[in-house]
Curated annotation (Swiss-Prot):
A Pfam family the protein falls into: Cpn60_TCP1
Organism: Acetobacter pasteurianus (strain NBRC 105184 / IFO 3283-01)
Class of this enzyme: isomerase
Full protein name: Chaperonin GroEL
Gene Ontology terms for molecular function: ATP binding; ATP-dependent protein folding chaperone; isomerase activity; unfolded protein binding
Organism ancestry: Bacteria, Pseudomonadati, Pseudomonadota, Alphaproteobacteria, Acetobacterales
Subcellular compartments: Cytoplasm
Length: 546
């Protein structure tokens, strides 16, 4: 086992603070509308330019092991905030740095770190209550667009697009962000349930120009196993032909004789039919087939449930207003499932999302939820160069998360104002002892840090701006860094999602509290590499002393 270095007390905290400062100073230049860019070197290709705090934090790795521990703890603040709220990473970093700095001074002055932490926690709880109390619900599309615009660093086109996407797919719908292949940024909305399986054979196409199959008011057979022979389902096919309606078969696969028979019938015009493979794999496939069955009001034909193909009747099949199939995707529009059944299924999936600990599973469950509850919207981000597209995509991602957060918990005045105003609530707070009071004062000073940093990045004096804002008793009054003016921020559309501000403060206080109460640090001692061995001496070669 490699030897370890151990640092104690002030020395440990001092090194950790250096790491915190290096990371925070690189991240905080991006804060606010006048925030600067940070250029990140890539091992191959062009460097990446970003104003996204968490992207900067993730790139920083320091040579000194102890400094690096401090930087990594601060990086954890940014990524945790990003995971929960999707935005506010720079605010969280600025808050954490301010709390750690002040806390470090207090511990150096001989105060009890545990009491400091208790004071910090008490003050944070009061501030969070204050934020919740003053949060204003987002109701109109215009308000939604404003939140998106602020998070996209003032680009109103992005805000509008996110607002439109949320209107179309609802708050449960999935909105994904992709890179476009051209200059324009565009929004694509898929209504109904879409899954990534196309027709099994091109002979099922009904529109040869577009190479798509469109079925109006079809029956839908949802079969779990492979179909190799149609013999067991002949009675069902006859019933479908007599009804005069098309049939869509969703099965694990359709091959051999079954596929040939279906194609021949389709070409002769006796049967309007199409077949697609079931989406997903393994257990996820079963769940998705069940989703389709609930959406279309049908049943999954599965031997596990004791249902055989021979016994299937028309009322076991699902129906929908329209099914659109192309080479890669199938879309079921307006399924005939009962609203209560769909609601029940949505509730069940939501419960699974709450329980799961895997990010991948959560993402897949959310996709299923969206397909049942709303729809899927895709924002394709364009730009003139690859670097620009990547930078804009970062901003669209941030804006999307911020907008979702605003719909969940409402909005507060932006520009760091809501946190700065919360300091007024901490003035008369009662603490058990003086050390705890100092902990509360640390939070009181730290809450002004984001407002001061936004002003500083805009070329103003942060302390002067903060005092001017707090002198005015109007809750929505603050500093518009973009225009360099004081105004009613909510009316001007400068707003932050309450969830983002709350999460940033909670995560910053949590990690900063841990750093303040650290008394020892252990890191691996770097091994000294042995000097490369020299060649043998050149003895015996006399006469070379000129």
């Amino acid at each position: 086992m490699a030897a370890k270095d151990v640092k104690f007390g002030a020395d440990a905290r001092q090194r950790m603070l250096r790491g915190v400062d290096i990371l925070a100073d690189a991240v905080k230049v991006t804060l606010g509308p006048k925030g600067r860019n940070v250029v990140l070197d890539k091992s191959f290709g062009a460097p990446r330019i970003t104003k996204d705090g968490v992207s900067v934090a993730k790139e920083i790795e320091l040579a000194d092991k102890f400094e690096n521990m401090g930087a990594q703890m601060l990086r954890e603040v940014a990524s945790k905030t990003n995971d929960i709220a999707g935005d506010g990473t720079t605010t969280a970093t600025v808050l954490a740095q301010a709390i750690v700095r002040e806390g470090h001074k207090a511990v150096a002055a001989g105060m009890n770190p545990m009491d400091l932490k208790r004071g910090i926690d008490k003050a944070v709880a009061v501030v969070i209550e204050e934020l919740k109390k003053n949060a204003k619900k987002v109701t109109t599309p215009a308000e939604t667009a404003q939140v998106g615009t602020i998070s996209a660093n003032g680009e109103s086109e992005i805000g509008q697009m996110i607002s439109e996407a949320m209107q179309k797919v609802g708050s449960e719908g999935v909105i994904t962000v992709e890179e476009a292949k051209h200059f324009q940024t565009e929004l694509d909305v898929v209504e109904g349930m879409q899954f990534d399986r196309g027709y099994i054979s091109p002979y099922f196409v009904t529109n040869p120009e577009k190479m798509t199959a469109d079925l109006e008011n079809p029956y839908i057979l949802i079969h779990e196993k492979k179909l190799s022979s149609l013999q067991p389902m002949l009675p069902l096919l006859e019933s479908v032909v007599q009804s005069g309606r098309p049939l869509l078969i969703i099965a694990e696969d359709v091959d051999g004789e079954a596929l040939a028979t279906l194609v021949v019938n389709k070409l002769r015009g006796g049967l309007k039919i199409a077949a697609v493979k079931a989406p997903g794999f393994g257990d996820r496939r079963k769940a998705m087939l069940e989703d389709i069955a609930i959406l279309t009001g049908g049943q999954v034909i599965s031997e596990d449930l004791g249902i055989k193909l021979e016994t299937v009747t028309l009322n076991m099949l699902g129906t929908a207003k329209k099914v659109h199939i192309d080479k890669e995707n199938t879309t079921i529009v307006d399924g005939a499932g009962k609203a209560d059944d769909i609601k029940g299924r949505v509730k069940q999936i939501r419960a699974q999302i709450e329980e799961t600990s895997s990010d991948y599973d959560r993402e897949k469950l959310q996709e299923r939820l969206a397909k049942l509850a709303g729809g899927v919207a895709v924002i394709r981000v364009g730009g003139s160069t690859e670097v620009e597209v990547k930078e804009r995509k970062d901003r669209v991602d941030d804006a999307l998360h911020a907008t979702r957060a605003a719909v969940e918990e409402g909005i507060v005045p932006g520009g760091g104002t809501a946190l700065a105003r919360a300091t007024l609530k901490l003035e008369g707070l009662h603490y058990h002892n003086d050390d705890q009071r100092v902990g509360g004062d640390i939070i009181r000073r730290a809450l002004q840090a984001p407002l001061r940093q936004i002003a500083h990045n805009a070329g103003e004096d942060g302390a002067v701006i903060a005092n001017k804002v707090l002198e005015n008793s109007d809750y929505n009054f603050g500093f518009d860094a973009q225009a360099g003016e004081y105004k009613n921020l909510v009316e001007a559309g400068i707003i932050d999602p309450a969830k983002v501000v709350r999460t940033a403060l909670q995560d910053a206080a949590s990690v900063a509290g841990l750093l303040i109460t650290t008394e020892a640090m252990v890191a691996e001692r770097p091994e000294k590499k042995a000097a490369p061995a020299g060649g043998p001496d050149m003895g015996g070669m006399g006469g070379m002393d000129f």
